[in-house]
């Protein structure tokens, strides 16, 4: 069985523990983080779990951080062939055209956005200029989706992006609306042909999984990916939980590897 964990966060060692604990506190997680987001730790847990690849990223909380983070992610991916690098942008960042070209030239094809921590809405007008450029360059967007406490990243914020840029492939993480898994809110987004999702911080987060299975059925079955949300959750434990889900074997195989391998057409995985 081959596995891609396409939702992992990494941080430089000097800030990893602080960043992870702050995230855990913000989301009021039901249990302490399993890990702290260092590269060495992720490499070890991937080997232990038998996971073949991990997409790695970190969101810039200011325009100043964009280039530093993108170069950090690239440097780690160049050292670890099982890492798939994913970049970041920020609404205040002005040099986005040049930075997107730099990313593409260095084999980075995705952009991670986390509106809650970046302090702008997913559909901020400034971001539309960046999404347009990403679409032109055959790049993809992966966004944290949902927070019942603040309305900056729910399905209604990704819907206009996916509709305006039909060739921009958009990954709506956490089944499309973390913490507010209302199928009627998610369905209009999930049915769009350029929208994908992952199961990170969803099935593991709630006890009543019935609504989540209903949401899962809204998506094209080939548009669903496995992600652990490391370091908040342990990839090995999340993989085991995924194997125990009430999902047909062939569909589960797609979620664990084939779907993202097909999605990530830039190189053979």
Task: Annotate the PLM regions.
Residues 41-45, 69-76, 99-103, 126-130, ...:
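A general structural detector for well-ordered alpha-helical segments in enzyme core domains, enriched
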Residues 109-110, 123-225:
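Catalytic pocket-lining loop regions of alpha/beta-barrel enzymes
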Residues 7, 46, 73, 103, ...:
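Conserved, mostly hydrophobic/aromatic
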Residues 52-53, 61-142, 147-149, 191, ...:
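Active-site gating/metal-coordination segments in enzymes
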Residues 10-14, 61-64, 91-95, 118, ...:
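Active-site environment of divalent metal-dependent phosphoester hydrolases
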Residues 1-9, 13-53, 220-223, 232-269:
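Mid-to-C-terminal alpha-helical segments outside catalytic/metal-binding sites
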Residues 3-11, 103, 130, 171:
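A generic "structured core" feature
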